[in-house]
């Protein structure tokens, strides 16, 4: 019997596999993931500095442990490049072809990356999974000043976390207040006040148009041509659902 294939080992993918195994212990089950397949709680990514936890400490179980618990095969560091719904096959980025009985796409979303000019864009990080968090945590070691692009939910969560971790944080938000699309003005004002009490500096109005290197530091260039000094930058301006492969199927 061809397996059920779940693409994605995040909260949705692993929870689906756990619930399915409560109903059926025998059906072949395979999970595919673009990362290392560790099980973790994604909301914890924006609490790691407050709790002083590394990526390894945020992980709940590795892929081998999850495979054993779920009686499943887990393929790590692979991506689906094409789906043939008529043949019920997947083509992976390594050229492998897999046949499925049923297919579940639980692969989440990609970060939206703004078009930025300058030679410092390689110091702009997005944190969307545990490997991203690990890379950022290693990169920020020994640094002090963080500029966050975006004052929405993720931007404010990281501003809070990094401030608690002892970093100086500036947040650039063009729309004039934190969480502008999620909260009414009184609640937004309360969030702003609480974060400013932690030392967070909000810069409302202009957007970020570039990041330039200035020796060992960075200069974040805003649309009004003002500049903000930084050691490292986080882009937190939103996510886009991963739908292109499914649309092409």
Map each language-model feature to its residues.
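A general structural signal for well-ordered alpha-helical segments in protein cores
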Residues: 13, 42, 63, 113, ...
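Rossmann-like dinucleotide-binding cores of NAD(P)H-dependent redox enzymes
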Residues: 59, 145, 154-212
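Residue-level detector of alpha-helix initiation sites
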Residues: 10-11, 36, 109-111, 131, ...
């Amino acid at each position: 019997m061809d397996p059920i294939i779940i693409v994605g080992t995040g909260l949705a993918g692993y929870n689906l596999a756990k619930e399915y195994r409560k109903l059926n212990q025998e059906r072949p089950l395979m999970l595919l993931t673009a990362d290392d397949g560790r099980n973790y709680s994604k909301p914890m990514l924006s609490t790691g500095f407050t709790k002083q936890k590394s990526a390894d400490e945020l992980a709940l179980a590795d892929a081998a442990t999850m495979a054993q618990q779920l009686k499943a095969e887990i393929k790590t560091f692979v991506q689906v490049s094409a789906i043939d719904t008529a043949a019920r096959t997947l083509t992976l980025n390594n050229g492998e072809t897999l046949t499925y009985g049923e297919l579940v796409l639980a692969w989440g979303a990609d970060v939206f990356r703004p078009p930025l000019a300058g030679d410092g864009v390689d110091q702009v990080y997005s944190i969307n999974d545990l490997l991203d968090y690990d890379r950022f945590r290693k990169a920020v070691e020994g640094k002090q000043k963080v500029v966050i692009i975006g004052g929405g939910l993720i931007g404010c969560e990281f501003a809070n976390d990094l401030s608690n971790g002892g970093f100086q944080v500036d947040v650039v938000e063009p729309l004039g207040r934190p969480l502008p699309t999620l909260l009414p003005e009184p609640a937004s004002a309360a969030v702003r006040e609480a974060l400013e009490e932690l030392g967070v500096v909000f810069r409302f109005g202009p957007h970020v148009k570039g990041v330039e290197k200035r020796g060992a530091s960075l200069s974040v260039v805003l649309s009004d041509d003002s500049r903000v000094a930084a050691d490292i930058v986080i882009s937190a301006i939103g996510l886009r659902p991963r739908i292109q492969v499914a649309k092409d199927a």
